[in-house]
């Protein structure tokens, strides 16, 4: 479900790759169907999860599910590539840490580290001076308290990803303000208690 929230809608097309023990036991344990259900926005207690392949077809979502050896990845890893008309492609790599919890470890090829269990702002931006200050100022203006902030980048002056966990839900006005800033490529907000 974190992947769907990050993408902002259910994808029209998805490629799902299972690695390690997910590849070995995913179908037997229902991991494959649970991943498709999450992309469709189904909650963990949704009775349609065993039928998620059929539901995806009915909703017009094409997908492929394959096993893949992902070098250096955690044994319980899934890699998901999502596409939809008018939405930039998104590639997410995450692994299970047990008990229904996950850790997102790559976003569009950049190493990251977050769970989506807290209110989380994810900003993809050009790696240049002043971006972190702009984000902090916008959050301060909206009276949002930052719990943690991590910054990742592909290379100096390349693309960066800020992962900001907050104590409150971030209002749409603050998200809109951030999206309007030059150098900001994409802004996504994960509300663990919000809609998918």
Residue ranges and their predicted role:
Residues 1-7:
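Alpha-helical support elements that line or immediately flank enzyme active sites
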Residues 11:
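Conserved active-site segments centered on acidic
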Residues 15-54, 58:
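A structural-propensity feature for long, helix-poor, extended segments
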Residues 20, 84, 166-168:
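Non-catalytic surface loops within mature trypsin-like serine protease
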Residues 27, 47-51, 65-68, 88-196:
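A conserved regulatory-domain signal marking ACT and ACT-like small-molecule sensing domains
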Residues 42-87:
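Contiguous domain-boundary segments centered on the initiation and propagation of an alpha-helix
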């Amino acid at each position: 479900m974190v992947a769907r929230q990050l993408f902002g809608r259910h994808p029209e097309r998805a490629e799902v790759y299972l690695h390690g023990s997910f590849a070995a036991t995913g179908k037997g344990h229902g991991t494959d169907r649970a991943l498709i259900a999450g992309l469709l926005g189904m909650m963990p207690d949704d009775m349609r999860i065993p039928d998620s392949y059929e539901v995806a077809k009915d909703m017009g979502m094409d997908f492929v599910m394959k096993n893949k050896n992902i070098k250096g990845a955690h044994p319980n890893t899934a890699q998901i590539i999502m596409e939809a008309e008018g939405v930039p492609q998104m590639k997410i790599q995450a692994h299970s840490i047990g008990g229904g919890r996950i850790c997102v470890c790559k976003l569009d090829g950049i190493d990251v580290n977050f769970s989506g269990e807290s209110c989380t702002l994810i900003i993809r931006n050009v790696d240049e001076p002043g971006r972190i200050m702009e984000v902090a100022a916008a959050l301060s203006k909206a009276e949002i308290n930052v719990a943690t902030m991590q910054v990742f980048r592909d290379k100096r002056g390349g693309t960066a990803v800020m992962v900001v966990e907050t104590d409150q839900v971030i209002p749409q006005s603050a998200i809109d303000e951030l999206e309007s800033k030059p150098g900001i490529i994409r802004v996504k907000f994960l509300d663990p208690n919000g809609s998918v």
